[in-house]
């Protein structure tokens, strides 16, 4: 093949890869869920160390919400379901939401 044809094709066939959209997982404050349970959720479900878990829990308590992390949609939605299931199982009204970054 002619080198000119290959050069023309080379530039046009490079696919553009788009990174997946990111979403924030946010815990919301309520008057019933204990601080200890929130910390436990952060450590067990989100794999936060104790220091980060306590910082996020205090944000939830003092500011009304705390950003847990950024994930792709599938992971964020799964995390929310896990939080709600754990809260139901332990009879707490803890809520968690997802918002686009």
Residue ranges: model-predicted function:
Residues 1-101:
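Terminal domain-initiation and capping elements
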């Amino acid at each position: 093949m002619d080198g000119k044809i290959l050069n023309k094709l080379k530039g046009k066939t490079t696919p553009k890869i788009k990174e997946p959209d990111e979403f924030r997982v946010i815990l919301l404050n309520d008057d019933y869920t204990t601080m200890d349970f929130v910390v436990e959720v952060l450590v067990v479900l989100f794999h936060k160390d104790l220091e980060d878990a306590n910082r996020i829990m205090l944000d939830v308590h003092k500011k009304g919400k705390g950003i847990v992390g950024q994930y792709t949609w599938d992971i964020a939605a799964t995390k929310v379901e896990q939080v709600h299931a754990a809260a139901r199982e332990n009879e707490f009204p803890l809520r968690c939401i997802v918002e686009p970054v």
